[in-house]
Amino acid sequence: EFLNRRSLQTQHLYYRKAFLSENGQYFDTLDSKPFSTEFSFSRFLVPELCRQQQKDGWAMFVDGDFLFLDDIMKLFSCVNNKYSVMCIKFNWVPPQDERYKLDGMIQTRYSKKLWSSLMMFNLNHPHIKKLNRDLVNTSTGSHLHKFRWTDKESIGFLPDEWNYVDGVTSKSLKPKAIHYTKGGP
């Protein structure tokens, strides 16, 4: 869907965890902790993979359960170079009775829940330069997903309509991207 919703040519890289592991990029192992899905940690390798291809500017990570309804290039027009990373800053914690998330994984409650599901990385920012293979592979899920690798002033807002989550995002918004956190449509 991403490829159909863009007004300009973009370069997109799609890497599976197995490929990253085989090429020495991703060596952290699944440890049965709640963050341990195949892409929980590897999403934070996007800046490193871009650096290896001599890319600069902005790069995006997006969970695989998104459906884009608008031109993705409009999202890139929202970026601000003063930030290391930009995302939708959800103020949401899963309800106590929601014990499992997609694919039967244990649902955890923590600040910044869902923030890392769509991230725009400023590849030229010094904090992003620290987000490398060694840091990603040796950090805890909490360190990565709570954005402890940058400071709070360096995390910018993206408009909520780019990460519309049913039951979380205001129903008054017209979504530009729908995030199916509980499974596909």
Q: Whereabouts are the PLM-identified features?
A:
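Glycosyltransferase catalytic domains, chiefly GT-A lineage
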Residues: 1-185
